[in-house]
Amino acid sequence: MAVIKVRKTGQVIEGEDNVRAFLNSQGVLYEHWDITKLPEHLRDKYVLTDEEKNEILATFKDEIEDLAARRGYKTWDIVALSDATPNLDELLKKFEQVHIHTEDEVRAITAGHGIFIIKGDKETGYFDVELEAGDVISVPEGNPHYFTLMDDRRVVAVRLFIDPSGWVAHPYEEKEEAVQ
């Protein structure tokens, strides 16, 4: 289950209903998928063949298609990151820059962990959303954020897009408050 940490205040928000309510107040979609549907051999695997990626997509076909129909997503894929990923540190440097997108950034975590650091409203400031398997998040178009891995440096996620070109980040320059 996701855990939120508000950087300004140190407040920690836990529990599915509390997390969903907080994220909803910030315009961020949060859902939870039943990760027990995923075959056991894929639950802790971070180097995936194309066949295994397709198996994950097939497992969550109904959830993906439902989310796509509700939010206008047209294409999806699997991203798998771990210490076995070539150039992982370079990729993380790219991901760890505060940026925006011209569409939602959607991730459904199927294995491992990741953190989205998201700019909330003026009162809230930046907050961390620690995600684990089963957590689904959609950071709205134009909302400053970045993503990084947790200490285990492993994640597998379904990514959904409107634009078939996939993940395209645009730099964001902080005008008033730094990411603390």
Swiss-Prot record:
One of its GO terms (molecular function) is acireductone dioxygenase (Ni2+-requiring) activity. The keyword Lyase does not apply. The record marks R107 as: Important to generate the dianion. Its EC number is 1.13.11.54, 1.13.11.53. Ni(2+) binds at H99, H101, E105, H145. Fe(2+) binds at H99, H101, E105, H145. Catalyzes 2 different reactions between oxygen and the acireductone 1,2-dihydroxy-3-keto-5-methylthiopentene (DHK-MTPene) depending upon the metal bound in the active site. Fe-containing acireductone dioxygenase (Fe-ARD) produces formate and 2-keto-4-methylthiobutyrate (KMTB), the alpha-ketoacid precursor of methionine in the methionine recycle pathway. Ni-containing acireductone dioxygenase (Ni-ARD) produces methylthiopropionate, carbon monoxide and formate, and does not lie on the methionine recycle pathway. PANTHER family: ACIREDUCTONE DIOXYGENASE (PTHR23418:SF0). This is Acireductone dioxygenase. It comes from Geobacillus kaustophilus (strain HTA426).
